[in-house]
Design a protein with these regions (language model features):
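Short beta-strand scaffold segments in enzyme catalytic cores
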Residues: 1, 186-190
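Nucleotide/phosphate-binding catalytic cleft detector across ATP-hydrolyzing
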Residues: 1-178, 195-197, 206
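Short, glycine/acidic-enriched loop or turn micro-motifs at the edges of active sites
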Residues: 182-183
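Short C-terminal beta-strands that terminate individual repeats in beta-propeller domains
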Residues: 201-202
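Catalytic P-loop NTP-binding/switch module of NTPases
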Residues: 209
């Protein structure tokens, strides 16, 4: 399929959004209201919901491993895999919130594989890559949209959404780096075997040159 841009609007935000993080909720709210107003005038239609991308200085990945001893050999079910994934999501991450989880692989015996369902084992080890951000970064962003009375359809991790559109699957399979140079931040995402393996946002950008 193809994507067509029907309208575009922007507001100067350097005084209240710094390195991708909302610092002044009121001013961010005002900018959002103005953007929606301009878009609706251009489109001559009402915008009901919006998709919001989150990135910024605090966004990065952390790895986690969940071990589960089954006591006896049994066939690994989807319910068991889901239970391990739920345990990973519930892990504390020090004043941060998990934005998205990328399952890496599962270790069964001495073997690693992407899909363990149907394999017989008495032990399973799940490896996960958690994309996290400061809790207040996500909260301030959501609060700004709430105060502007703009309904959010979904909250997306911006680098993942951009890479999905711009990076060919063959490159992700072979291994590649996706680098997004911004004004105040630079985002680096590493892909290998079709999966995200590392992501970080560096607080340096074009304004530092």
């Amino acid at each position: 399929g193809t994507l067509q841009v029907l309208a575009y609007a922007q507001e100067e935000a350097t005084s209240f959004i710094r390195k991708g993080l909302v610092y002044n909720i009121d001013k961010t709210c005002q900018a959002l209201v103005e953007i929606i107003k301009n878009l609706e005038e251009t489109l001559d239609s009402k915008i009901a919901k919006v998709y919001v991308g989150i990135s910024g200085q605090s966004v990065h990945t952390i790895k986690s491993v969940i071990n589960r001893s089954l006591g006896k050999t049994e066939i690994i079910s989807q319910n068991l895999v889901d239970s391990i994934s739920d345990e990973n999501i519930g892990l504390p991450v020090d004043n941060k919130v998990i934005l998205e989880v990328i399952p890496q692989e599962f270790k069964i015996g001495d073997n690693y594989q992407k899909d363990p369902v149907g394999v017989a084992s008495d032990h399973i080890e799940g490896h996960y890559l958690n994309i996290v951000a400061r809790e207040d970064a996500r909260k301030n962003l959501l609060h700004s949209f709430e105060k502007a009375d703009i309904e959010i359809a979904d909250l997306l991790v911006s680098p993942l959404a951009a890479a999905k559109l711009l990076v060919p699957e063959a490159d992700k399979r072979a291994g590649c780096a996706f680098i997004d140079f911004g004004a105040e931040t630079t985002t680096v995402a590493i892909f290998k075997n079709e999966l995200l393996r590392f992501l970080t946002v560096i607080p340096l950008g074009g304004n530092n040159i």
